[in-house]
């Protein structure tokens, strides 16, 4: 049984994002899960896992409460290669959504609470010298997922996520390590027809809004919980959590909407100064795209910065300061903040 709980101010979303106002504290984020393991299922070379979970997360664009169960079988094909097959069922409830005004009526009615039933599979090759703080090796992985109404999901989509990381000691400089990585995510929702019941204007008798006749519309959107987001301590560090994007995925007030595609590129030079202290310089680039057809390297946004690592018994304690290299102005006239500070445990990638 594993749990995770975070403590923060009990304020509205703006105070969470910008650290303003309020003095009350509350447990606003938590995750509780329990896992049952069955080695060598039915005498095979596959190991089985069944996990139940409940989680509440606070994101810049919405709050997410999710609960569900996941059944997984994994196989160690070689010492470096692992494969897995999964079936997942869950209920996602999104609240406190910050949406584009034109999207609010549609998204609020279709996806306030959505049931997902998915099949997924993955293949990973890992040759890192140390999974916590690698100095040599590579990681390559491909994940694919499908949700469909025929298997009990309320929405359908297909999604894939690919990533590759490489780590090398600089020849002739054993205290220097170069790390680089690339991530690509693509998702395509299945179009379906749904009936909406819009509210008609106030009637002549002054009885208020009345439900008009249903209209049928074609829907091809992903729920908020299934969209890609980026920005933060493990993606592009010049941006705060989920704040990477442009006009298509960040609204007029700076709130992230997520997208159907993502590109992330990272490069980092790690220098060991003492037995417990490392200094790091990094360059990150990427973007979140509203549609797969919108993916373009010309729309990549970037950030650079530096950081400090303290080698603790639980892993590197990390402090990074990222700078945006292409600040933009929101439609409301506000300019993006120039920097983002991140404090975490473990390497960024």
Model-derived regions: residue spans:
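Secondary-structure transition/capping motifs at alpha-helix termini
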Residues: 1, 40-45, 75-81, 164, ...
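Gram-negative/organellar outer-membrane beta-barrel architecture
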Residues: 1-132, 138-141, 237, 244-249, ...
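Outer membrane pore-forming secretion/assembly proteins and partners of Gram-negative envelopes
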Residues: 27-31, 258, 305
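Short hydrophobic "helix-edge" motifs at membrane interfaces and signal-peptide entry regions
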Residues: 33, 273-275, 303-304
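C-terminal outer-membrane beta-barrel translocator/porin domains of Gram-negative envelope proteins
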Residues: 86-271, 276, 281-285, 289-291, ...
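Glycine-centered small-residue hotspots that permit tight backbone geometry or close packing
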Residues: 232, 238, 303-307, 315
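Short, loop-centered acidic/histidine patches that primarily coordinate divalent metals
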Residues: 282-286, 309-313, 320-324, 348
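Strand-loop-strand
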Residues: 291, 296-312
């Amino acid at each position: 049984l594993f749990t995770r709980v975070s403590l923060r101010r009990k304020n509205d979303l703006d105070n969470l994002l910008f650290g303003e106002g309020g003095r009350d504290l509350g447990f606003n984020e938590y995750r509780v899960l329990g896992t049952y393991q069955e080695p060598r299922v039915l005498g095979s070379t596959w190991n089985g896992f069944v996990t139940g979970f409940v989680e509440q997360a606070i994101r810049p664009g919405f709050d997410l409460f999710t609960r569900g169960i996941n059944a997984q079988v994994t196989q160690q094909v070689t010492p470096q290669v692992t494969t897995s097959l999964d079936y997942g069922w869950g209920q996602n409830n999104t609240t406190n959504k910050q949406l584009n005004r034109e999207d609010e009526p549609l998204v609020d009615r279709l996806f306030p609470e959505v049931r997902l039933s998915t099949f997924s599979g993955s293949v990973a090759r890992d040759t890192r010298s140390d999974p916590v703080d690698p100095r040599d090796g590579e990681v390559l992985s491909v994940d694919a997922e499908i949700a469909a109404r025929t298997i009990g999901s309320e929405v359908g989509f297909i999604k894939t996520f690919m990533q590759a990381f490489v780590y090398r000691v600089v020849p002739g400089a054993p205290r220097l390590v170069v790390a680089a990585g690339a991530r690509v995510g693509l998702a395509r929702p299945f179009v379906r027809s749904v009936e909406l019941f819009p509210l008609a204007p106030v009637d002549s008798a002054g009885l208020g809004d009345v439900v008009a006749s249903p209209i049928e519309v074609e829907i091809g959107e992903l729920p908020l919980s299934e969209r890609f987001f980026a920005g933060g301590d493990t993606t592009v560090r010049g941006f705060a959590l989920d704040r990477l994007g442009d006009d298509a995925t960040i609204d007029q007030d700076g709130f992230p909407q997520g997208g159907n595609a993502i590109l992330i590129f990272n490069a980092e030079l790690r220098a060991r100064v003492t037995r417990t202290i490392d200094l790091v310089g990094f360059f990150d680039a990427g973007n979140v795209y509203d549609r797969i057809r919108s993916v373009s390297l010309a729309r990549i946004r970037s950030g650079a910065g530096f950081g400090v690592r303290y080698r603790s018994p639980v892993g590197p304690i990390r402090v990074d300061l990222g700078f945006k290299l292409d600040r933009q102005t929101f439609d409301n006239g506000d300019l993006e903040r120039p920097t983002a500070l991140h404090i975490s445990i473990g390497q960024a990638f």
